[in-house]
Amino acid sequence: MVASSKMMNVRVTTMDAELEFAIQQGTTGKQLFDQVVKTIGLREVWFFGLQYTDSKGDNTWIKLYKKVMSQDVQKGDPLLFKFRAKFYPEDVAEELIQDITLRLFYLQVKNAILSDEIYCPPETSVLLASYAVQARHGDYNKGTHVPGFLAKDRLLPQRVIDQHKMSKDEWENSITTWWQEHRGLLREDAMMEYLKIAQDLEMYGVNYFEIRNKKGTELWLGVDALGLNIYEKEDRLTPKIGFPWSEIRNISFNDRKFIIKPIDKKAPDFVFFAPRVRINKRILALCMGNHELYMRRRKPDTIDVQQMKAQARDEKNAKQQEREKLQLALAARERAEKKQQEYEDRLRSMQEEMERKQANLSEAQDTIRRLQEQLNQVQAAKEELEQRQNELHEMMQRLEETKNMEATERAKLEEEIRVKQLEMQKIQEEVTLKDSETKRLHEEVEEAIRKQVAKGSRAAAALQAATTTPKHHHVEEEEENEEELINGENGTQDFSKDFDTDEHIKDPVEERRTLAERNERLQDQLKALKQDLALSRDDTMETPNDKIHRENVRQGRDKYKTLREIRKGNTKRRVDQFENM
């Protein structure tokens, strides 16, 4: 993009995009701002502003009704601006309407937490990281989201990582465990849950300014959606004095002196000093904007806002219905894949069973072969026995025929007969033993064959059943899916969730509770995370904010309990307390 003598190149960076424009020399801040919001489709413009770095290196908000070129923007081509949230809602769930608004806030707050601009305790950091993963990647899928999947994602403040002796894999496992808890949560809903938890952090949405009281004590002034708070120099987590916007009647400054006039006319002015006049200008602009939004929230919505909310509800309902249809389709697919896997497992099991039976059959055949060999040996032994018996019979006949034989010859023949009888006895014993063994083997073979035939029939039947998908499953699944889809559509057609507001609350802090205090499940999650992280915590890496937070928790403080406490008493008492700090 080339700038002419009458045009200037401008680059505007949002939290997730870069936009480039060519503007005229006379273009005002509002004209540039309007061009940006039109390009990104943003309608909740009251929260946002254009930020630039001035010639002194400070971040400054562009003035809408002054020409861009007349403001103290660092010269360059292109001119650089950031599109950022300038004001924060009191309650994100009540006020944020458009998805684009939600996304921009989510990205800005997440970046502030990860860079430690907003202090976040370790257990809350891990829980927020799990919502961030859901917002980016959707539902956890074991097949897709394998170990190491989150390795390149920036999910935790470096402070938290340094304070725990845990590997990257251990951090990923911890975050993934909680990520799985968010299954079915829309990405936009995950962003909202993130912000609902983040807005209870003490430093969320607070703009801090260095100030001094009349005594010259260095302090912090915190400006946010709920009012003004005073902090000691070493503790930006725990405000010591607070003034809700409803108590403030007038704001002004004179040079470095800033004056706040309370509604209570008996109370003295609240006066402090800023280091530079330009700081007072920024404080004034933030006070005016936050006060205006504070009062606007307590009035009925304009027609434009009502239309935006109605449109957002319709879009959310339509998106929810599409989500439910998709979930039903995915569930049906998972059931079908599960059944298919079951059939494949059964088929594989039956095939393995058949292979085992085949192996057993081969073993039985080997046994039969050995039995046949044994039978052959028995038969051979019987034949040998019969031959020896014949030989003995012949010898007995010879003995009978040689009664008159000499004594020596007769004795020799008798000895041969005795030896032959012993051989026959031994062979007879072997035949008997082999006969018994053959009979036992024969019985075993018959039993094995009988069992093999029976099991083979059952295995064949099971194998046949496993390879044929029952038809009634298809019919049943189809009917179930159709019924579930119809029920799902009927269940969401009448569903509606309005952003409830109570315009009669004078000071919202009085009835405000942290999400953790209102949500027992969140309490349990944070408690479990804290216990898990304690096992690997390195106390030597504890920061001053960690110590302050730990002490606040020990004393039972949280953001809103502290705000209620510091707003007690009349305005005069609090102004006097400030002067004496």
Swiss-Prot record:
Source domain of life: Eukaryota
Annotated membrane topology: Peripheral membrane protein
Family matches, as PROSITE patterns: FERM_1 (PS00660), FERM_2 (PS00661), FERM_3 (PS50057)
Chain positions covered by the region annotation Disordered: 452-519
Keyword Cytoplasm recorded: yes
SMART domains hit by this protein: B41, FERM_C
Molecular-function annotations in GO: actin binding; cell adhesion molecule binding
Keyword Ion transport (UniProt): no
GO terms under cellular component: adherens junction; apical part of cell; cytoplasm; cytoskeleton; filopodium; microvillus; plasma membrane; rhabdomere
Ranges of compositional bias, category Basic and acidic residues: 495-519
GO biological process: animal organ morphogenesis; establishment or maintenance of epithelial cell apical/basal polarity; neuron differentiation; positive regulation of early endosome to late endosome transport; positive regulation of protein localization to early endosome; regulation of cell shape; regulation of organelle assembly
A Pfam family per the record: FERM_M
Subcellular location: Cell junction, Adherens junction; Cell projection, Microvillus; Cell projection, Rhabdomere; Cell membrane
Record PANTHER family: MERLIN/MOESIN/EZRIN/RADIXIN
Function noted in UniProt: Involved in connections of major cytoskeletal structures to the plasma membrane.
Name under which the protein is recorded: Moesin/ezrin/radixin homolog 1
Organism field: Anopheles gambiae (African malaria mosquito)
